[in-house]
Amino acid sequence: MESYIIDTYQGVPYTAAVQVDLIEKDSNPATLTVWFPLFQSSTPAPVLLDQLKTLSITTQYTASPEGPVLQVNAAAQGAAMSALPKKFAVSAAVALDEYSRLEFGTLTVCDVRSIYLTTLKPYGMVSKIMTDVRSVGRKTHDLIALCDFIDIEKGVPITIPAYIKAVSIKDSESATVEAAISGEADQAITQARIAPYAGLILIMTMNNPKGIFKKLGAGMQVIVELGPYVQAESLGKICKTWNHQRTRYVLRSR
């Protein structure tokens, strides 16, 4: 079993983001990834990771109003595991690799192949932005983050688009606002890195948020889900070899 700590915050308490790679116990095993709901811990990260290695997990492929999901049941040993969520659901589209199939409605016993623990700031200092492009009210534009990485192993640049939010802007103002957004982002974000959670996330630490970012307080860590965009690559490989270069912002008319 492989295990990794992605350390973005060294204080106590911290928010734990746990993702686990699994393989089905079956003659034709499926490989899948599940991620636990965020939880807060004061246990040192190496100790928490050791206790996570005792995880036993079952999944069940089923349906929900949001689409196909995996219902996850988990158990683990250790005092720190009392804070670990034990029952939850994850998107099957992100959890399953493109070659794997699970039988609908059947309880699946899984072996743990790798565990990723990312330490984030405490509750109240972490803001999670979902990649959800559904309309909200009378919005005119979508704010998109273009996350530029380089594969340091191959020297290949990669750009991942991530939906941030819907905004209302007049067409006559869009060019000016887009220029301002770019400037605001340059000043607002002091650090950005990727980590394995919900497939993959971009963690941005905000320094001096203003303008379109002003609702995010200074010192906040902002999480943007990237998982749906990178299913073709091994998450472990991405975390080891992709280096974040910059994040640009653009407005797209609806």
Swiss-Prot record:
Membrane topology reported for the UniProt record: Peripheral membrane protein
Location(s), subcellular: Virion; Host cytoplasm; Host nucleus; Host cell membrane
BP GO annotations: virion assembly
Official protein name in the record: Matrix protein
GO MF terms, alphabetically ordered: structural constituent of virion
Disulfide linkage: none
Pfam family, one: Matrix_Pneumo_N
Family according to the record: Belongs to the pneumovirinae M protein family.
Keywords: Host cell membrane, Host cytoplasm, Host membrane, Host nucleus, Membrane, Viral matrix protein, Virion
Cellular component GO terms held in the UniProt record: host cell cytoplasm; host cell nucleus; host cell plasma membrane; membrane; viral envelope
The organism's place on the tree of life at top rank: Viruses
Subunit text: Forms dimers. Forms higher-order oligomers. Interacts with glycoprotein G (via N-terminus). Interacts with protein M2-1; this interaction directs the matrix protein localization to cytoplasmic inclusions comprising viral proteins L, N, P, and M2-1 and mediates the matrix protein association with the nucleocapsid.
Function, as annotated: Plays a crucial role in virus assembly into filaments and budding. Early in infection, localizes in the nucleus where it may inhibit host cell transcription. Later in infection, traffics to the cytoplasm to associate with inclusion bodies, the site of viral transcription and replication. During virus assembly and budding, acts as a bridge between the nucleocapsid and the lipid bilayer.
Gene symbol of the encoding locus: M
